[in-house]
Regions:
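Membrane-proximal alpha-helical signals and transmembrane carboxylates
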Residues: 1-154
């Protein structure tokens, strides 16, 4: 009986070894450092620092559109900074499942230059994270981008 089980185990391992393995090609990953999320009428827009844009009626639809529209595989677990357009705060709970809890959050009045905002936030990290927001802290810092300067009001 033991030899039959051993033979079946060897056969199973052999068959599984012949099946095609589909891994992820790291060259196709599109990691994002900064996301800009805004609501325009009834449509939610999500834009990455890589220039990819997704839109939809829900956050799930916008993320799915973002992933479909990029040439590679958008990887949102690398996002360090979330820029929310003022008035879009209700979208935060819907973003929890896509972003790390340590992702810094700040509000912006208008669309920023995402690359410049990322560079500024690397040296002036906001004190608000998704985890803080989830725990009840609701005062989101405001990032103001001017031509050559940026300010973070906490």
């Amino acid at each position: 009986m033991k030899w039959i089980i051993s033979l079946l185990a060897i056969l199973l391992i052999t068959v599984l070894g012949w099946l095609p393995f589909r891994g992820t090609d790291v060259a196709t990953l599109e990691p994002a450092e900064t996301l800009y999320v805004y609501l325009n009428k009834e449509t939610i827009y999500i834009e990455t620092d890589g220039g990819w844009l997704g839109k939809g009626n829900t956050v799930d639809e916008a993320v799915a559109d973002l992933k479909e529209s990029s040439p590679g595989q958008v990887f949102l677990q690398t996002v360090d900074y979330l820029l929310l357009q003022m008035g879009s705060e209700e979208l935060l709970p819907m973003l929890y499942s896509y972003l790390r809890s340590g992702c810094s959050v700040c509000s912006v009045k208008e669309k920023p230059d995402i690359e410049k905002a990322s560079a500024y936030l690397r040296t002036h990290r906001p004190g608000m994270t998704l985890q803080h927001y989830r725990a009840g802290k609701k005062d989101i810092p405001i990032l103001i981008m001017m031509e050559e300067r940026a300010y973070l009001y906490e």
